[in-house]
């Protein structure tokens, strides 16, 4: 799957939105990628995650385990693991706490794991997920995502491959361009934010 193929999947699903959005990172953007419009369609999800699995194979070789951050990463992580013939596990957190492997999940010695995300903006969830895996005896070979909207600038502390890399501007609330400030903001994301 090419980057253009993936973006066409987002367009066809009505998942490429324009307006004024508050992202889960707290940053503001004129573009929002509504991944759940993709993941609510099992056939489309299978197609895009098979593309991600092919990219993972090409970059990292065989992997045994796909790890994703809950909740948003569970569906693409599971479907990518299925395409790779790997096991799917996830990290989760108590409210306000760090990510951790629970439910008996582990990355045993000798296992090769990749962290799979849906969309990377700042890389915060990915970094937190990878930090939770450092104590595991298995090898974390790298990270992968459907879309890196940071233009390749997000530093995860691990190699990252993306089906598509976009350079979508994001702004702190106090640095909005006038055309964005003129549009009422909506918050379609999933991560809880602290009131400012």
UniProtKB/Swiss-Prot annotation:
The protein's enzyme class: transferase
UniProt keyword annotation of Magnesium present: yes
Subunit structure: Homodimer.
Domain of life: Bacteria
Gene3D superfamilies on file: 3.40.50.2020
Family matches, as PANTHER family: OROTATE PHOSPHORIBOSYLTRANSFERASE, URIDINE 5'-MONOPHOSPHATE SYNTHASE
Residues involved in orotate binding: 121, 149
Family according to the record: Belongs to the purine/pyrimidine phosphoribosyltransferase family. PyrE subfamily.
Catalytic activity line of the entry: orotidine 5'-phosphate + diphosphate = orotate + 5-phospho-alpha-D-ribose 1-diphosphate
Upper taxonomic lineage: Bacteria, Pseudomonadati, Pseudomonadota, Alphaproteobacteria, Hyphomicrobiales
CDD domains tied to this protein: PRTases_typeI
The species this protein was found in: Methylobacterium nodulans (strain LMG 21967 / CNCM I-2342 / ORS 2060)
Pathway membership, UniProt: Pyrimidine metabolism; UMP biosynthesis via de novo pathway; UMP from orotate: step 1/2
E.C. code: 2.4.2.10
GO MF assignments: magnesium ion binding; orotate phosphoribosyltransferase activity
Binding site for 5-phospho-alpha-D-ribose 1-diphosphate: 117-125
Role description: Catalyzes the transfer of a ribosyl phosphate group from 5-phosphoribose 1-diphosphate to orotate, leading to the formation of orotidine monophosphate (OMP).
PROSITE patterns associated with the record: PUR_PYR_PR_TRANSFER
InterPro entries attached to this UniProt entry: OPRT, Orotate_PRibTrfase_bac, PRibTrfase_dom, PRTase-like
Keywords of the record: Glycosyltransferase, Magnesium, Pyrimidine biosynthesis, Transferase
Protein name: Orotate phosphoribosyltransferase
Database matches in HAMAP family: PyrE
One GO process term, biological-process aspect: pyrimidine nucleobase biosynthetic process
């Amino acid at each position: 799957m090419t980057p253009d193929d993936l973006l066409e999947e987002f367009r066809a699903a009505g998942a490429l939105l324009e307006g004024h959005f508050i992202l889960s990172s707290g940053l503001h953007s004129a573009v929002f990628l509504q991944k759940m419009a993709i993941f609510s369609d099992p056939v489309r999800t299978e197609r895009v995650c098979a593309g991600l699995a092919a990219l993972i194979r090409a970059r990292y070789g065989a992997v045994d385990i796909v790890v994703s951050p809950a909740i948003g990463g569970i569906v693409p992580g599971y479907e990518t693991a299925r395409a790779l013939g790997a096991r799917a596990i996830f990290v989760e957190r108590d409210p306000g706490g760090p990510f951790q492997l629970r439910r008996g999940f582990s990355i045993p010695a000798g296992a090769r794991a990749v962290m799979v995300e849906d969309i990377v903006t700042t890389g915060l969830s990915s970094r937190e997920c990878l930090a939770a895996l450092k104590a595991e005896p298995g090898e974390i070979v790298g990270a992968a995502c459907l879309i890196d909207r940071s233009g390749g600038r997000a530093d995860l502390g691990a190699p990252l491959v993306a089906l598509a890399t976009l350079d979508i501007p994001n702004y702190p609330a106090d640095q909005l361009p006038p055309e964005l400030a003129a549009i009422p903001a909506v918050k379609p994301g999933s991560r809880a934010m602290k009131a400012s």
